[in-house]
Amino acid sequence: MWGHDLAGVDLSITRPSAVAILSGGIKILRVEYGELATRLSKMEVVAVDAPLTLPKGGAFRDFEREILRRGFRLLPLNIKSMRELALRGSELRKALEQEGVIVLETHPTTVRRILGLSRKDLVQLMVRMGYHGERLLSPDDVDALTCLLISILYVEGKVEIVRGEEGSMVLPLPGSIP
């Protein structure tokens, strides 16, 4: 549909990660952490729901403080599980970037708030865009689809990149639903 191989990942530290892939059609997979880089190495863009860098100090990175100022909620990186997720995210980012993949950090809840979409609305949008899943979607699956939407919007130039010295987060421009 878009002529690009794109993906969205809801990264997990305790179970296989939910991965939404656009390559011809849209499909959702569950992938063990050790297989993620290999499975995603041929993608052009991968958006990830996980911190991809660690803060230099404190609970939030500089660009996250800007997102918090806008009224969105994020989990602090001084929580042990978030720190572990950030370490995995950083490893995945480095592995994929070595393969030439563009890796984006995003936050699905914030994405859906900006676009005014509920989880159900997001799934309906992805069905219109080519997703034909046969099973009930978990919250992780919906987050992976939301990340995939960010990859699509990135290719279309319909995103804002909130940048800082400690990394960046990619968010949709308001009203940018394809």
Question: Where in the sequence are the language-model features?
Answer:
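Phosphate- and other anionic-substrate recognition elements at nucleic-acid/protein interfaces
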Residues: M1-P178
